[in-house]
Amino acid sequence: MEEEVQQHSHCMNCVSRRCMTRPEPGVSCDLIGCPLVCGAVFHSCKADEHRLLCPFERVACLNRNFGCPFTLARNKVAEHLEMCPASVVCCTMEWNRWPVSYSDRKSYESLSRDVDEVAQLDMALALQDQRMLLESLKVATMMSKATDKISEPREQISVKSSVQEIPRTNGLVSVDEESYGALYQATVETTRSLAAALDILNSATRDIGMLNTSLHATANEMDEENNKESFQDKNLKDQDHLDEGEIGAVGGVDYSGTSQNAQAEQNGSSDLLCDLNPSSNGTSALCNGFPLEKMCIQVKGQDQNFHGDSTESNITNGDCVEADGTSEPSSSLVVPEQLREISPFSALPDSTFQQILMPDEDDEKDLCWKKVDLGDLKDVNGSPFSHAPSFKFLSNSWYIPKEDKAVDTSDLEVAEDPMGLQGIDLITAALLFCLGDSPGGRGISDSRMTDVYHVDFGTQTFSLPSAILATNTMVGEIASASACDHANPQLSNPSPFQTLGLDLVLECVARYQPKQRSMFTFVCGQLFRRKEFSSHFKNVHGDIHAGLNGWMEQRCPLAYYGCTYSQRRFCPSTQGAKIIHDRHLRSFGVQPCVSTVLEEPSRNCVLGLRSDHLSSLPFEVLQHIAGFLDGFSLCQLACVSRLMRDVCGSLLQSRGMVILQWGKKKYPEGNSSWQIKEKVWRFSTAFCSVNDWKFADILSMADHLKNCSYNVIEKREEAIPLPCMCVTRELTKEGRSLRSVLKPVL
């Protein structure tokens, strides 16, 4: 046995089909032919090597690791890949839609009224895109409770200060002057804290020596005042939770937690480090009602004297100047060098995080590393704060009396609900929330900065359903009956999913072209066998999608006023067949015409019209019949009965496709890896290829306009003079020419 397996010295280099060398032990062996009759002749010791090259040798498919169960001859592998069930292609075609404007909202509500009764391709695709958008769109909580808030775990490194604790008197108490440059915050308790901070700044500019002695009492008074205000604000928030009516935003800036902020001055420059810590009751800061993550903001001064014309001080970080001029070490927060060298806010990319030492929320003595998103520091309006501002122009502004107000829409002096947005449905509210954070969209409220010191806060000018504001679930769950009970009664009837909030017209923008952020982008994302992908892309995206704007589906010209009539101008080459859209499969399909000759026997049947003759056929016959159907039809047939489901299931390997579902497996050591959880077999949604399109045998749109209820003819019998003809008779009496009469009189 070993002699047959081992390579002989002669056989290693012999490639002749007519080798005449006699077999000798250890030197050569006999010539044999391929057992699969591929025509190859070789020495018997090379049989295993030939099996690696034989074209007739049966091997597993190249996609066996992706779920293909077939084994076939090696020369059939390339041909099999075109129809391999594991050779799946994902369609990445994209299209875009604009949200419905406020002026067109009424007309789109009338268009969505009879969507279940009348099958319209453009409306079906638009509603499908809207359902996909709402299923993936998560509405942020506007009224978050402390019990519902789940704080994200973060690693904290406790750092004890070895220096004796001294009150923070190294400079001025920092004020959050730039946080609203990226995100506006609306709370009630912030205005009083800001006033207290401004008083400290005012007193510091007048007499820097008196600041050290008076800051102890001021900090204690601020703590007592903040505790009192937070208790009152908590009662107000509890009352707001009970009220499920209309909700409006209140302008303001959250400066809570200013006692925990730190500032260091060195060589006349100031470094402000602001921390948006949560309030005392455990809830996070609110931005126009939305919860915000903690972020840190730094302002660097470049050799600027913060105190105007006063003498330049030599206060260093961590030093405190006493009344006699001596300095003592302080336990104030040390700003790391990596934070001081931050690039300008305009150059920061999105989602740029950095670990920064900041005081702990529970104990100010401890320092912990907090993860800060530096991308949040960018201004939404495109004009970010300078990271090295000059405070010379603020030298006299501290002496000007200032007043902070929390305003609402009562002083706008406009009619109540001027745009007719009272009681908007959940779909409109969800899209409005999604566009509110977009600079290109129409925000619910906005803030504008005139300079570093003056900020104009936007306020919410209309009410929104409480179901949107008081929940933190997906929009699809919000639109359920349980969520609608908390909202206005009219929101549940009609169903919010039937009200179209997206434009019917598709906008095709290439990936490399910039898009408006208020435009929604949709991806096909359907899976097909490799041989089905070309026909899907040509028929669905090239023919149907391109013809929905008036060629494939032609709407009445008066659709803007509410007419829902439409007609199919094009049909497949087979006369009578039509394009349909299945809401459950989320795909288009071709419905062939049924000949009247085939319908007559069923009418004359004794058993009635509902008799099922197809199920009485043998299983093999049903398999043969189902083999002629496309994937879209097989998906429909599998939903008819258990028998038809078994028939379609027997065709999965030859007509279906296999998809891998991955799952994350965790090991006892703590690490994890992704492994194949299961292999799912199903049919694709591809329909038979349509090579030619023809005009359907239908009436003209002009015939519909004759009977259209919206085509109301308004006859103008009374003459209406032009502006220049108001004094025609008087001018003509004077004998002036007609040309001078027609000229406008100025």
Curated annotation (Swiss-Prot):
<dbReference type="Pfam" id="PF15965">
    <property type="entry name" value="zf-TRAF_2"/>
</dbReference>
<dbReference type="GO" id="GO:0061630">
    <property type="term" value="F:ubiquitin protein ligase activity"/>
</dbReference>
<keyword id="KW-0833">Ubl conjugation pathway</keyword>
<keyword id="KW-0597">Phosphoprotein</keyword>
<feature type="region of interest" description="Disordered">
    <location>
        <begin position="222"/>
        <end position="241"/>
    </location>
</feature>
<keyword id="KW-0479">Metal-binding</keyword>
<comment type="subunit">
    <text>Part of a SCF (SKP1-cullin-F-box) protein ligase complex. Interacts with SKP1, CUL1 and RBX1/ROC1.</text>
</comment>
<comment type="function">
    <text>Substrate-recognition component of the SCF (SKP1-CUL1-F-box protein)-type E3 ubiquitin ligase complex. Required for muscle atrophy following denervation.</text>
</comment>
<feature type="domain" description="F-box">
    <location>
        <begin position="611"/>
        <end position="659"/>
    </location>
</feature>
<feature type="compositionally biased region" description="Polar residues">
    <location>
        <begin position="256"/>
        <end position="266"/>
    </location>
</feature>
<dbReference type="InterPro" id="IPR043013">
    <property type="entry name" value="Znf_TRAF_N"/>
</dbReference>
<dbReference type="GO" id="GO:0006325">
    <property type="term" value="P:chromatin organization"/>
</dbReference>
<dbReference type="Pfam" id="PF15966">
    <property type="entry name" value="F-box_4"/>
</dbReference>
<dbReference type="InterPro" id="IPR013083">
    <property type="entry name" value="Znf_RING/FYVE/PHD"/>
</dbReference>
<protein>
    <recommendedName>
        <fullName>F-box only protein 30</fullName>
    </recommendedName>
</protein>
<dbReference type="GO" id="GO:0016567">
    <property type="term" value="P:protein ubiquitination"/>
</dbReference>
<dbReference type="InterPro" id="IPR031890">
    <property type="entry name" value="Fbxo30/Fbxo40"/>
</dbReference>
<dbReference type="GO" id="GO:0007059">
    <property type="term" value="P:chromosome segregation"/>
</dbReference>
<dbReference type="GO" id="GO:0030261">
    <property type="term" value="P:chromosome condensation"/>
</dbReference>
<dbReference type="InterPro" id="IPR001293">
    <property type="entry name" value="Znf_TRAF"/>
</dbReference>
<feature type="zinc finger region" description="TRAF-type">
    <location>
        <begin position="49"/>
        <end position="110"/>
    </location>
</feature>
<keyword id="KW-0863">Zinc-finger</keyword>
<feature type="region of interest" description="Disordered">
    <location>
        <begin position="247"/>
        <end position="266"/>
    </location>
</feature>
<dbReference type="GO" id="GO:0010467">
    <property type="term" value="P:gene expression"/>
</dbReference>
<comment type="pathway">
    <text>Protein modification; protein ubiquitination.</text>
</comment>
<dbReference type="GO" id="GO:0008270">
    <property type="term" value="F:zinc ion binding"/>
</dbReference>
<keyword id="KW-0862">Zinc</keyword>
<feature type="compositionally biased region" description="Basic and acidic residues">
    <location>
        <begin position="225"/>
        <end position="241"/>
    </location>
</feature>
<dbReference type="InterPro" id="IPR036047">
    <property type="entry name" value="F-box-like_dom_sf"/>
</dbReference>
<feature type="modified residue" description="Phosphoserine">
    <location>
        <position position="383"/>
    </location>
</feature>
<keyword id="KW-0832">Ubl conjugation</keyword>
<dbReference type="InterPro" id="IPR001810">
    <property type="entry name" value="F-box_dom"/>
</dbReference>
